[in-house]
């Protein structure tokens, strides 16, 4: 079931993210790939910046994690990962819907690699729309703390909805 993750789940978050992120290897620009994909210090910084993780646990193992972050007047969906063995079984959808229920803003954004069509399609399936390149650049620089090279090679999707 879905639950809010705590410091006790830190290693589990890292395990899911780094296990699933292997799919990016050879697809995202090689200068952006690193192993582990998300080092522990980077995850600490994400949590300190306000990303709250939620996870799905089955048989005492986390199979999916996803983060949510409110920044000023928008909500960001961050670090959405489902173990490969559990993909296309509704876990990502259920986590996303749970986070959208928590979001209190009228605009929700998700960023991902341009070279990850599976991730783009996932968000589009749930009503998100790709923003223009100019808007993407502005949004990534305003709401995310990522290198310029990642800005160049990413996309942003937006979900407009009624504020809570």
Language model segments and positions:
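Conserved beta-strand-loop-alpha-helix junction that forms the acyl-donor binding cleft
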Residues: 110-120, 136-141
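Conserved acetyl-CoA-binding loop of GNAT-fold acetyltransferases
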Residues: 124-133
């Amino acid at each position: 079931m879905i639950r809010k993750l705590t410091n006790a789940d830190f290693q589990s978050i890292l395990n899911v993210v780094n296990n699933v992120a292997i799919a990016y290897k050879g697809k995202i620009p090689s200068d952006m790939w690193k192993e582990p994909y998300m080092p522990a210090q980077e995850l600490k910084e994400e949590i300190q910046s306000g990303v709250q993780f939620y996870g799905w646990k089955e048989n005492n193992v986390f199979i999916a994690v996803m983060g949510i972050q409110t920044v000023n007047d928008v909500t960001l969906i961050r670090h959405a990962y489902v173990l490969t063995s559990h993909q296309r079984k509704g876990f990502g959808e259920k986590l996303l819907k749970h986070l959208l229920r928590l979001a209190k803003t009228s605009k929700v954004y998700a960023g991902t690699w341009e070279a990850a069509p599976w991730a783009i399609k996932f968000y589009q399936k749930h009503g998100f729309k790709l923003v223009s390149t100019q808007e993407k650049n502005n949004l990534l620089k305003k709401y995310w703390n990522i290198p310029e090279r990642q800005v160049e090679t990413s996309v942003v999707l937006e979900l407009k909805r009624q504020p809570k």
